[in-house]
Every structure is written in structure tokens, then in C-alpha cells.
Curated annotation (Swiss-Prot):
Primary subcellular site in the record, as a coarse category: cytoplasm
Localization per record: Cytoplasm
Site description Lowers pKa of active site Cys, residues in chain: 147
UniProt source species: Xanthomonas campestris pv. campestris (strain ATCC 33913 / DSM 3586 / NCPPB 528 / LMG 568 / P 25)
Name assigned to this protein: Octanoyltransferase
Other comment: In the reaction, the free carboxyl group of octanoic acid is attached via an amide linkage to the epsilon-amino group of a specific lysine residue of lipoyl domains of lipoate-dependent enzymes.
Pathway: Protein modification; protein lipoylation via endogenous pathway; protein N(6)-(lipoyl)lysine from octanoyl-[acyl-carrier-protein]: step 1/2
Gene designation: lipB
């Protein structure tokens, strides 16, 4: 009898666990320093995490940011940070998610990573029949020409930090004090202004579910917060 070669056994791709930490309302700088520390000290055994937060009012300038795009900040502080991109605004009513993911473990590149975040946002908005789209060369998500979500990321040793900001139900006036993402007269909008819910929890739940679906994650909420102390 002729021998029949056995088919190779292919292990199924299992969903990967990721802890979700809801930080509540926080100043920007302590969270930024904490995710830097997390990324600098992690290794191949460190689990992935998603940090969810609302920030007190702040403008952040990315590595490509130009001071001339900060038009009239007034009382709102401006921070130069180490993410990609230009200038943006964070404030109450905006959902910010920092995916701290090992792209090597997920077996995806940076371009796919960005596309997956954008798709998660687009699918989240579809939950409320809001039609959103991405733009070539201008990362983020747009509705009818107005930006509703911004992306600013950093990848170090194959691991991501920084992330996305999603305008849910916020005062959009501070965006008029800058050229958002470096674009003069770029319009911005929010989920609430487009007929979606005002509640942060409802939007948060859908977005986290969509991010888990895009990246193949099993989310594990935890009440433990990262160390948010600033270095002396």
C-alpha cells in the first residue's frame, strides 16, 4: 500500500487576551509618561492592554507638529509629545483609547494597524447609522468632510502606544484655536452632533467591541490603574 502523506496540522489562531483599564478623567502628561514606561519595560511575555481615558483640556503637538498651527490656545496648555502627527485637542466628552499592542504577536504591520483602528471607528459609527470614511494620506475618520476621530501613534520595538481620540459629546470650540492635524479650516464634528448618543459608556462599549474584533482580542476589564506618578 502506498503511504499517504499526512496533512500538516495548522494550529488555530486563538483570540489573544488584552486587559482593559478605564482610567476615567486624567491629565494628559501622567498618562503619557505611564504608557511610555509600560512600552519601555515590556517584553515578549508582557500582555497587551487597552487604556481608556478622557483627558482634561490640552493641546498636543506630535513630532511633525508646527507651532504655527496652534493659533490661540488661551488658557489651554500645549504639550509637545512623541506621537506621530500634528496638533490636536483633547478634552472632556472625547473618548481616548491607547492600544498598547505587540504588533509582532498580532502579525500585522503599522499600515494594517492604522487601517484596523479606522475600521473599528467606522463600524462603531455604523451602529448609529452614521456613515463614516477614511481618507488617503490623512489618518483618521471623517463624516461628510468633518473629522470625528484622530489618530496619533508611536511604535517602539514593534509595540504601539498613543492611539485614537473620538469626539463623542464634547465642546468643539477649542478646535477653532488650532489647525486640527495641521489642516487650515478643517471642520470637526461629534457623535452627538450627528444624532448619536451622548453617553460615553454606550459608545465606549461598542468601540471596544469593534477594536477587539479587528485585532482578534479577548478583552479582560480590570479595575487596577497604571502608576500615573510623574518622575521627580
Amino acid at each position: 500500500m502506498d503511504a499517504v502523506a499526512a496533512e500538516p496540522v495548522v494550529a488555530p489562531v486563538l483570540p489573544l487576551p488584552a486587559q482593559v483599564r478605564d482610567l476615567g478623567m486624567q491629565d494628559y502628561a501622567p498618562v503619557w509618561r505611564a504608557m511610555q514606561r509600560f512600552t519601555d519595560t515590556r517584553d515578549e511575555h508582557t500582555g497587551d492592554e487597552l487604556w481608556v481615558v478622557e483627558h482634561t483640556p490640552v493641546f498636543t503637538l506630535g513630532q511633525a507638529g508646527k507651532p504655527e498651527h496652534v493659533l490661540a490656545p488661551g488658557e489651554i496648555p500645549v504639550l509637545q509629545v512623541d506621537r506621530g502627527g500634528q496638533v490636536t485637542y483633547h478634552g472632556p466628552g472625547q473618548l481616548v483609547v491607547y492600544p498598547l499592542l505587540d504588533l509582532r504577536r498580532l502579525k500585522i504591520g503599522v499600515r494594517d494597524y492604522v487601517c484596523k483602528i479606522e475600521q473599528a471607528l467606522i463600524d462603531t459609527l455604523d451602529e448609529w447609522n452614521i456613515v463614516a470614511e477614511r481618507r488617503d494620506g490623512a489618518p483618521g475618520v471623517y463624516v461628510g468632510g468633518a473629522k470625528i476621530a484622530a489618530l496619533g501613534i508611536r511604535v517602539r520595538r514593534g509595540c504601539t502606544f498613543h492611539g485614537l481620540s473620538f469626539n463623542v459629546a464634547m465642546d468643539l470650540e477649542p478646535f477653532h484655536r488650532i489647525n486640527p492635524c495641521g489642516y487650515q479650516d478643517l471642520q470637526v464634528t461629534s457623535v452627538l452632533d450627528l444624532g448619536g448618543p451622548s453617553g460615553m459608556d454606550a459608545v465606549k462599549a461598542v468601540l471596544l467591541d469593534q477594536l477587539a474584533r479587528q485585532f482578534g482580542l479577548v478583552l479582560q476589564p480590570t479595575s487596577a490603574l497604571p502608576d500615573l506618578s510623574l518622575p521627580a
